[in-house]
Amino acid sequence: IQLPGDENSLLPVHSDTWAGDSPFEVVAWVPLVNVFSTNAMFILPKKKYKKISFNKIPFKTNDDLYKKISKHLKFIKIQYGEILIFNQNLPHGNIVNKTNITRWSFNCRFKSLFSPYNQKKFLEFFVPLNIKPATLDGIDYEEPNFK
């Protein structure tokens, strides 16, 4: 929930992978109202992301980074009923909502059971929604101990 003028619900520019999420997941961002301008989130487009070497940008805080890349950030415009599926490796966040509309939104993360994890491991952070029978067979498989 992001109320107009509320400075307590801010997420400064970040990438979820910087906080331990797997680079092999995607996020479905679901706003429950029309979002635009400052009541939406911003994201660094993939084309710009690929041109920036974050290891070469001198910054100590999220605010420093925001100042360096702010001219490239794009605010998302989505109508109620639409969702954004995005690469959470891309820097994103929000700023103070300067509109008169409260933003209600939630997000869900999706990744394959078999894609690499980062700091947030299987069943520590993720719960499988659907495991196929072939996957269950593979999980249950025990290698015979031939002698």
State what each model feature region is:
Residues 1-8:
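Long, hydrophobic, well-ordered secondary-structure blocks that form the structural core
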Residues 8-76, 119:
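Catalytic core of non-heme Fe(II) oxygenases with the double-stranded beta-helix
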Residues 49-147:
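Conserved double-stranded beta-helix
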